[in-house]
């Protein structure tokens, strides 16, 4: 669990870089809950990752940053690091899985980041080990860095500022850094609020871990929900995540696609696959009733894929 003081300090630290995003109501007839959307897709990089990346980089010393920055990311953390590196005049090396969407890769390059593609298993090994062969810059772990998690936790502070009494907060689960950060803030200030995670059923590692009582490998099937889900919950994250999560959900990819369409039609919001996971959980009723806050974690989706989904594609 991240200390509340660290999250509150992060809010001050990142104020010049990250946007205080709105919390808006999603009005849908016969919805099973009173659904609210925390629109992190409106950040400068269209993802919440700017929060954690900025906080972690600002916590590092000038000497630590001098050789440049390195991270491993499916795309959004990469953009956060590249954004901050450009602002500081530093080089950034980004290691991505070879299935990363072109929209995210183009954004990394546009921000000045140097992209290195790896097969998924090799990329996942970087996540596990925190090491990239052939680089000597400051490695910013996209998940388990305490500064990253504290920055992510600022989302929880903003949610409670706008809606002090949510019944549940639904968080898309990728590596666990967003969940630990947000849940730490919520547990400290609103302990009665349920913490619910959502993963694509094609890569529901947390669901499997909770069922088994420990991290366990699952079959990973790539889908357009590329920013969430994994082969296995990181051993380092399991003791942090497990006590904070009240329910873990596996969402069918077709329901995520339907949520992408609903957000576009009803509130003119563009969500990537991971960003639509939480709304999908709420719209299907899996997240429960009452006031349900859904974190729309990002909006970096290939426009061709978005067009396909808006046209009725289910995966």
What are these regions (language model features)?
Residues 1-315:
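PLP-dependent amino-acid enzyme catalytic core
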């Amino acid at each position: 669990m991240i200390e509340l003081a660290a999250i509150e300090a992060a809010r001050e630290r990142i104020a010049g870089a990250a946007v205080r995003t709105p919390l808006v109501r999603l009005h849908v007839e016969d919805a099973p809950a009173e659904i609210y959307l925390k629109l992190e897709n409106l950040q400068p990089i269209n993802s919440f990752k700017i929060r954690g990346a900025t906080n972690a980089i600002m916590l590092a010393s000038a000497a630590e940053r001098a050789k440049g920055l390195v991270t491993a990311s499916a795309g959004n953390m990469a953009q956060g690091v590249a954004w901050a590196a450009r602002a500081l005049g530093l080089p950034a090396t980004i290691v991505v899985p070879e299935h990363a969407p072109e929209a995210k890769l183009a954004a990394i390059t546009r921000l000045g980041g140097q992209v290195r593609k790896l097969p998924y298993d090799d990329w996942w090994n970087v996540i596990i080990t925190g090491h990239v062969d052939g680089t000597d810059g400051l490695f910013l772990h996209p998940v388990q860095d305490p500064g990253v998690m504290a920055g992510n936790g600022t989302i929880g502070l903003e949610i409670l500022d706008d809606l002090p009494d949510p019944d549940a907060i639904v968080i898309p689960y990728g590596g666990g850094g967003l969940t630990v950060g947000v849940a730490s803030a919520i547990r400290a200030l609103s302990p009665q609020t349920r913490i619910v995670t959502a993963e694509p059923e094609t890569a529901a590692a947390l669901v499997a871990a909770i069922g088994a009582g420990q991290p366990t490998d699952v079959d990973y099937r790539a889908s357009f929900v590329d920013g969430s889900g994994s082969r296995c919950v990181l051993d380092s994250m399991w003791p942090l995540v497990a006590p904070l999560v009240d329910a873990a959900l596996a969402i069918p990819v077709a329901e995520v696609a339907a949520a992408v369409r609903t957000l576009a039609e009803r509130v003119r919001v563009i969500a990537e696959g991971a960003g639509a996971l939480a709304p999908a959980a709420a719209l299907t009723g899996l997240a429960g009733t009452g006031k349900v806050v859904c974190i729309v974690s990002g909006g970096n989706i290939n426009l061709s894929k978005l067009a396909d989904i808006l046209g009725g594609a289910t995966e």
